[in-house]
Amino acid sequence: FSACSAPAEKAATVDMDKLKVEIQAKEDAFAAAEKAKDAAAVAAYYSQDAISYGRNEEPISGNAAIKEGIAKRLAKDTTGNNNVYKIVDLFAEGNMVVEIGSWTMLNPAGAETEKGHYMSVFQKRDGNYVCVRDMNVTSSSAK
């Protein structure tokens, strides 16, 4: 009965090299905004309806609440540490991207103080990928 069926839509081919550069640029901007203690710039990573699943806390829903949480965290931070985010795996289908990455916290001297992994789900909206869900874990032993 395949003759009666409409032909399947052909999925657009994703240029994974280009996509990796685009998503890594988002991670680099996120890290730079954290270092600058600019909560609004960090929150620009997230969609308006995003949900962020952090360590040792309940999920935070919505860009405004995420921004507020980021602002509180940045205001409390007096260590001078900064984070580096790197893509480990990237998967794309249609307008969705799943990124699995690693993060490393460095002290002002550049020494590693903590590390872990994260997963971010991006959706392309108005021609731009925004994070709709993310979560992170630490690989460091409990303090």
Model-derived features: where do they sit?
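Short, low-complexity N-terminal intrinsically disordered segments enriched in polar/charged residues
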Residues: 4-45, 142-143
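A solvent-exposed, acidic/Ser-Thr-rich amphipathic alpha-helical stretch
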Residues: 17, 21-22, 39-95
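Solvent-exposed loop/turn segments at secondary-structure junctions
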Residues: 49, 57-59, 104-106, 137-139
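Short, cysteine-centered beta-strand-loop-beta hairpins and adjacent loop/turn segments enriched
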Residues: 77-78, 105-113
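A short hydrophobic beta-strand element
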Residues: 94-103
